[in-house]
Amino acid sequence: MLKKVLNGTRIAKKLEFKILKQVNYKLSLGQRPPGLAVILIGSNSASTIYVKKKRFMCEQVGFISKFWKFSKNIQESKILNLIYKLNYDTTIDGILVQLPIPPNINNQKLFSSIIPTKDVDGFHPYNIGSLCQKSPYLRPCTPFGIITMLKHYKIKIRGLHAVVIGASNIVGRPMSMELLLAGCTTTITHRFTKNLKHYVKQADLIVIAIGHAHFLKGTWIKKGAIVIDVGINRLKNGEIVGDVDFKTAYKKSSYITPVPGGVGPMTVITLLNNTLKAYEQISKDCK
């Protein structure tokens, strides 16, 4: 079976051009550009880099991005007040609170305070519930970015046994819902799962998101499996690697995502696509 490295950067570039074309058309009609509000709490270096990347991408496709940065000791009520104002700001179509959020702030409370139609990260209970009910609106960016990538490469996953390693609210749980929606038989594993190798060895498709460098070895993977690596880990030497031991997993897999350049770009482009979708819905509602 032909081995392929799934190039998220290349797909994202194509989708970026498509979004820019749509935005330019809207502007030619005299409409305002889409607007994304980004809130950063604390000074996490990785978060700062991610925010810069997202804002840069906004500019590339003609979006307006507005940015608020707060110290990690900010009162939760002040963030909630800002979100309340942004919910009713007619120039803002999407609201993003960059993760991770300091432990003194209830992240679920923040996600729930964003109105569902501006929840471009897809974490509001309404949007998660809609995904579970098989009628998704704004979908969590990383899981849907992965589905978009698989579709782009025309990889058929209906009927496959998919194993998700990691059960976070951000990736693992919504990923399992996306895979169910796509027709997979889905197993979700977590830190309490006994005999993890047993489940992984049965998988036709593996999605791993646990934040543990080189955790998944090629010896665990059955020949021909599809391997999707969501992990981003920095080694002591500064190298960025995923949760998968790429060299050994590559030998066994049929398709595999690299880190960097795999899932990451798909997450960002899905955020932009969600923002455009929210913008178009708001524009339609205003007519």
Curated annotation (Swiss-Prot):
UniProt similarity note: Belongs to the tetrahydrofolate dehydrogenase/cyclohydrolase family.
Gene Ontology terms, MF aspect: methenyltetrahydrofolate cyclohydrolase activity; methylenetetrahydrofolate dehydrogenase (NADP+) activity
BP term (GO), one: purine nucleotide biosynthetic process
Stretches of the chain forming a coiled coil according to its record: none
SUPFAM superfamilies to which the protein is assigned, alphabetical: Aminoacid dehydrogenase-like, N-terminal domain (SSF53223), NAD(P)-binding Rossmann-fold domains (SSF51735)
InterPro entries cross-referenced by the UniProt entry: Aminoacid_DH-like_N_sf (IPR046346), NAD(P)-bd_dom_sf (IPR036291), THF_DH/CycHdrlase (IPR000672), THF_DH/CycHdrlase_cat_dom (IPR020630), THF_DH/CycHdrlase_CS (IPR020867), THF_DH/CycHdrlase_NAD-bd_dom (IPR020631)
Catalytic activity, EC: 1.5.1.5, 3.5.4.9
Keywords on record: Amino-acid biosynthesis, Histidine biosynthesis, Hydrolase, Methionine biosynthesis, Multifunctional enzyme, NADP, One-carbon metabolism, Oxidoreductase, Purine biosynthesis
Organism, as annotated: Buchnera aphidicola subsp. Baizongia pistaciae (strain Bp)
Binding site for NADP(+): 166-168, 232
Protein name (record): Bifunctional protein FolD
One Gene Ontology cellular component annotation held by this UniProt entry: cytosol
Biological or metabolic pathway of the protein: One-carbon metabolism; tetrahydrofolate interconversion
Top-level taxon of the source organism: Bacteria
Chain segments annotated as transmembrane: none
Subunit relationships: Homodimer.
Catalysed transformations (reactions): (6R)-5,10-methylene-5,6,7,8-tetrahydrofolate + NADP(+) = (6R)-5,10-methenyltetrahydrofolate + NADPH; (6R)-5,10-methenyltetrahydrofolate + H2O = (6R)-10-formyltetrahydrofolate + H(+)
Reported function: Catalyzes the oxidation of 5,10-methylenetetrahydrofolate to 5,10-methenyltetrahydrofolate and then the hydrolysis of 5,10-methenyltetrahydrofolate to 10-formyltetrahydrofolate.
